[in-house]
Amino acid sequence: METPDYNTPQGGTPSAGSQRTVVEDDSSLIKAVQKGDVVRVQQLLEKGADANACEDTWGWTPLHNAVQAGRVDIVNLLLSHGADPHRRKKNGATPFIIAGIQGDVKLLEILLSCGADVNECDENGFTAFMEAAERGNAEALRFLFAKGANVNLRRQTTKDKRRLKQGGATALMSAAEKGHLEVLRILLNDMKAEVDARDNMGRNALIRTLLNWDCENVEEITSILIQHGADVNVRGERGKTPLIAAVERKHTGLVQMLLSREGINIDARDNEGKTALLIAVDKQLKEIVQLLLEKGADKCDDLVWIARRNHDYHLVKLLLPYVANPDTDPPAGDWSPHSSRWGTALKSLHSMTRPMIGKLKIFIHDDYKIAGTSEGAVYLGIYDNREVAVKVFRENSPRGCKEVSCLRDCGDHSNLVAFYGREDDKGCLYVCVSLCEWTLEEFLRLPREEPVENGEDKFAHSILLSIFEGVQKLHLHGYSHQDLQPQNILIDSKKAVRLADFDQSIRWMGESQMVRRDLEDLGRLVLYVVMKGEIPFETLKTQNDEVLLTMSPDEETKDLIHCLFSPGENVKNCLVDLLGHPFFWTWENRYRTLRNVGNESDIKVRKCKSDLLRLLQHQTLEPPRSFDQWTSKIDKNVMDEMNHFYEKRKKNPYQDTVGDLLKFIRNIGEHINEEKKRGMKEILGDPSRYFQETFPDLVIYIYKKLKETEYRKHFPQPPPRLSVPEAVGPGGIQS
């Protein structure tokens, strides 16, 4: 709808003189608003000045100016004369966003009533909520949250800026960087803001805070973010970690705080190859050096030489007890690799004289080759005195760039290969990552004890749980692997499962198809692992989804694969949900879930019209189940004894309903260990195994019926950070 022209006389076009008057009145209106002269504003509006006039440079309208000045009276006056509350400045800011900057709740309320969108943003992605957080306006923040503001919205900026990895910050990041403690606590405690959200550079609120030297209250803010679970190994500009940033700040308290966190990577290197300890020595920070040494920081750099170069005798004296030989490299005999498979070759490489490529010693020879790749190969290497696998790419290789970008952005994670550094030399890129012992394909071929114990395949569950966790981590950082296969899943010397080979990975911006590819590959990997690699993965890739589902050995595996093949709309969070799938439950947990549901009062008293029994009822069009006539499948002596309890009390015996079956399982669990039930226990054996084998589709049936209801409270909940259970096999699988 066009804005009416209040300055055009009836009956024809305006004269040149009247046009000059209009322009002058428009300019005067803006100046009157800026001065807060409400009388003059009213006079000009009544005279016909344009309420939507804007100055040429930045596009400020009278309404923008009135909101900035906090003049409710002038705002109302302008709105009554046709001022457009949706008009944007040249940077896309609306009057509503300006009100967020000012933290004026009254003006926010007025503009919302005029149709403003609570989540509208300018060209840099700033919303009123983000502006309130950035400026510490707690009252405005609470008001906007109550009106539906998106707490975790990321700044959506222009395509050109996204290419430069700009934008993507959240309100929490702004509040943390600016040192607004009250707003930070409100966002985390009351509004449940995502503490580890990442911007387009992969930075979270913690690293943005530590790298901003102007941030106030930095120690308290860091403590709050860490307590709420912020990733302490995240990387920021130039590959800096929070620990490195704290050392560069020369802030001993921050260093102590970070070193106290479990999982801190004390030896992480920035893009220049510097560790926190090296920086502390170079900056002559004796107290921080002491802290890092006591925490076991790696002493592989020329630390004593650096201290001597700086003529810091006290620091030299501090370092000497921690450095085995400050003047020479350790002899080959004193260097022992962790790898058993590659140990002999690594010792040979360590002892030979080779020209160093930066911090890397490598010999491009078949004796030290791990595997071939599409562009080159993977070789053994020693990087900074650490055994590594080195992927060799052509210089400026798109695949190599993808590999480095993904590894850096995703940071350290126990289910991804660790990234130690890169070197460039003579047209080649050398990417150094953690060295592993086997591919998944090789590992499944190793001789081991029978992995399936009493029908429960803990071995497969352990491996797949690690793989799922690694892929989930990848997706949370905005990457899709695109090449999940047994050759790209590795097992290290500690039997930990690690995802590798990210040279085909894609940075996705919400395109679900990228993630669907990973989920489909995961579905095939589930079947591959469960079947112990008996069917080659390439063969599984040629089979359609329906054929693969029919190959599943049990209902839990079948449903898990189906969920991966058909994730629905919630593609991004699919793996988060599936980590709680019955496939990953132990048999004891499955049995406990059935007992707990059976312990619901509606089931115990057979309340036929209850919501729970209605949910559990078998629908007419559903396929037949193993438990449809369940009373006939229970051992007759056990069934008779359990029914006898009700017959004595002249109550109905157990019926062929799901509710009664759950009630039966509950009662068995409550009484089977009683002395008088010894005979029953001898017949049933382990109840968890008995019911799983007798009714193999019962657990998945209950799960699918109740997973979207309040009764999911009976399901075992995965811990915040899933750890992989001990597996049978050569040494077990670790997380």
Curated annotation (Swiss-Prot):
User: What are the KEN domain coordinates in residue numbering?
Assistant: 587-722
Q: Which co-factor is required? A: Mn(2+); Mg(2+)
What is a single molecular function from GO for this protein?
Answer: protein kinase activity
Q: What is the induction note for this entry?
A: By interferons. Virus replication in higher vertebrates is restrained by IFNs that cause cells to transcribe genes encoding antiviral proteins, such as 2'-5' oligoadenylate synthetases (OASs). oligoadenylate synthetase is stimulated by dsRNA to produce 5'-phosphorylated, 2'-5'-linked oligoadenylates (2-5A), whose function is to activate RNASEL.
The C6-type zinc finger ranges are 401-436
Q: What ranges does the record give for the region Disordered, renumbered to this chain? A: 1-21, 714-735
Tell me which Gene Ontology terms the entry assigns under biological process. Answer: defense response to virus; fat cell differentiation; mRNA processing; negative regulation of viral genome replication; positive regulation of D-glucose import; positive regulation of transcription by RNA polymerase II; regulation of mRNA stability
Q: What does this protein do?
A: Endoribonuclease that functions in the interferon (IFN) antiviral response. In INF treated and virus infected cells, RNASEL probably mediates its antiviral effects through a combination of direct cleavage of single-stranded viral RNAs, inhibition of protein synthesis through the degradation of rRNA, induction of apoptosis, and induction of other antiviral genes. RNASEL mediated apoptosis is the result of a JNK-dependent stress-response pathway leading to cytochrome c release from mitochondria and caspase-dependent apoptosis.
Protein name listed in UniProt: 2-5A-dependent ribonuclease
Query: To which species is this protein native?
Result: Mus musculus
Q: What is the lineage of its organism?
A: Eukaryota, Metazoa, Chordata, Craniata, Vertebrata
Q: Which gene encodes it?
A: Rnasel
